[in-house]
Amino acid sequence: MDSSLLLRKPVDADVESMYIMLENSLSPYLTVNNSSSRNFQLIIDKNVVEDYVKRDVYLCLVVEINSEIAGWLAGSSKTEVLSAHGCSLGAFYIEEIVVDSRYRRKGIGSFLLRGIPKDRLKAIVVDTPLINKEAITFYEKSGFVKVLGLSEEFYKTWTRMSKPV
């Protein structure tokens, strides 16, 4: 499928589609969140998506198929973001990787991961809710392994995964 995919930076007009895709992707997990733990907050906020698109601190990429966004990724290797997530310098932290349900298991997520510039990186890091088994399986198949080192409270609801570059 790679030959028909277009990887590009998003524009302001993409924010609405990206937001809806994020909302659709996370909505199944919001209904099972009965925990009051602040460590299990899934944020669905259009302003956050706008930040990913507009702020230079983030790398944001979209994948298009036939002029339609099939998936997108946002992350950063900037100190400001890495320190906020407890990551070491030299990492790239994935804030979001979202694939439209119609395009899952078709290589879109892997295509997005390959779009991350690897220069001077030591690892790619992502946090995902334990209940999102589909995401965990995707990351494991992509070479990510579960890592420890954060608070015990974090690991009650989330898992951190890392892949050496």
Residue positions per predicted region:
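A short beta-loop-alpha structural element at the N-terminal edge
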Residues: 5-20
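Conserved GNAT-fold acetyl-CoA-binding loop/helix
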Residues: 23-49
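A short helix-loop-beta-strand connector motif used in the catalytic cores of GNAT acetyltransferases and
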Residues: 47-62
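Conserved beta-strand in the GNAT
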Residues: 62, 68-77, 93, 98
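Conserved acetyl-CoA binding element of GNAT-fold acetyltransferases
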Residues: 84-101, 127
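Conserved acetyl-CoA-binding loop-helix of GNAT-fold acetyltransferases
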Residues: 99, 105-118, 137-141
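Conserved beta-strand-loop-alpha-helix junction that forms the acyl-donor binding cleft
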Residues: 104, 125-137, 152-157
